[in-house]
């Protein structure tokens, strides 16, 4: 990946011209490397469900963004999710920061496969 590409991916969620969806959901792409991407989210009241923990939709969205960004480090074309599933192993804390790390596991033809792990502070 070129440095220009790296900067473009990092700036996609921050600063002028940032993707509105990521900004609205408080997500920032904080690191990218060939086949990996890190997305962070400082939890806000609108990120939480009625039990005070991060809403499952927030976690799913973070996973999708991190996985897609990881694929974009290897491909120059637009990517989109064909299929996705998630397993919630435990509830995240309702304060602090969440970190999602997307990793490409396999690419070929027009498809790529990735996984994302999300952790709280």
Residue ranges and their predicted role:
Residues 1-121:
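Terminal targeting signals and extreme-terminal segments of soluble enzymes
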């Amino acid at each position: 990946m070129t440095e220009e590409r790296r900067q473009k991916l990092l700036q996609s969620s921050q600063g002028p011209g940032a993707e509105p969806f990521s900004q609205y959901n408080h997500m920032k792409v904080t690191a990218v490397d060939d086949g990996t991407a890190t997305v962070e989210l400082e939890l806000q009241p609108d990120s939480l469900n009625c039990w005070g923990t991060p809403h499952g939709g927030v976690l799913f969205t973070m996973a999708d963004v991190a996985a897609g960004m990881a694929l974009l480090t290897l491909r120059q074309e637009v990517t989109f999710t064909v299929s996705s599933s998630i397993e919630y192993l435990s509830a995240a804390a309702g304060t602090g920061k969440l970190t999602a790390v997307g990793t490409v596991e396999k690419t070929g033809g027009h498809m790529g496969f990735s996984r994302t792990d999300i952790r709280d502070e």
